[in-house]
Every structure is written in structure tokens, then in C-alpha cells.
Amino acid sequence: MTYSIVNDAAVERNVAPWEISRVPSEGVIFFDAPTQSITPQGLMPFTFEHGATWYQVDEARDNRKINADGTGLYAYANDGLLFVKRFDDLGPTCPAPQEAEIQVYVNAGKTYIELEAQGAYTSLKPGEVLSWTSRWYLLPQDTDNTPSQVLADLVGTVVK
């Protein structure tokens, strides 16, 4: 899916593409990033296993949102499916202020989780266009939705 941001204003604007996918508040989320790249630290229980950082949905009932500097992909496994998103990897200075390439938001009511991907923060002159692509993959999987090499390897079959 390719998005375009068009600056129709008469002045220069700073923008960053941002895509949110809402998923059920269950299952497991994982992405390629060291746990120390997650901010704020300690807000959600992430572990590093099988070459990825994992968040298995927990019982906490607070609004929580983390930022992470990943490698341009994240995955979510639940209910027999694996959802993978691939997008441009950002350098550490590319995200918008106070933002990150990967964001995970869990709402207090535990009714959904937002998986967010963000592109580079850039300046658009009047009339300029920014295009940004996010590729989605949906695969069957038969794990118990816990961190596993099987899930990590399955992502590798579509993201090379």
C-alpha cells in the first residue's frame, strides 16, 4: 500500500507518514530491535528471544505506548494468523520529534492494540509530494502465540 502526502499549503510543512493497524488485545507482537531501543523502558514487558523483541499481551489495564527503533518490520500472531508489515527502515535521526519507526499502544480497556509504523520526518515545500509504502502479509500459523523460532522463521519466509 503506498500513501501520498501532498502539501497543498502555501508554506513549507514538516510531515511524517504514519500508519496504524488495530488488532485484538491478545496474541504476541514482535519486531527486530534490541529491547534497550524501546522507550520508555519498563512500561510493557518485552523480552528478547529468537532474534527478535517480543511482547506477549499482558493483564495490565493502563494506557501504554512505547517507541522502538526497529528494522522496518513488525509482526503480530493470534488466532491462527500471522500479520506482518514491512516498511522503510529509519535511521535513529529520521523519526518525527518524540516519535519512532515502530510504536505499540495498548488501551486501558484492553479492547485493542495499535501497531504503528512511521516514516521519515521531512519537510515538504508547497506542491511537493511524499510517498511512503507499507507492505502487508497475512499467513496461516499454528503456534500457541508465544515467542518461538517457528514464528520468527515464518516472518523470514515473506521478508527476505
Regions found by a protein language model. Name each.
Residues 1, 113, 132-134:
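Hydrophobic residues positioned within well-ordered beta-strands of beta-sheet architectures
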Residues 1-4, 16:
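Short, hydrophobic/aromatic alpha-helical segments in well-folded domains
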Residues 8-130, 141-153:
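A contiguous, surface-exposed recognition patch within enzymatic or periplasmic domains that forms
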Residues 157-160:
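Acidic, Ser/Thr-rich low-complexity intrinsically disordered segments
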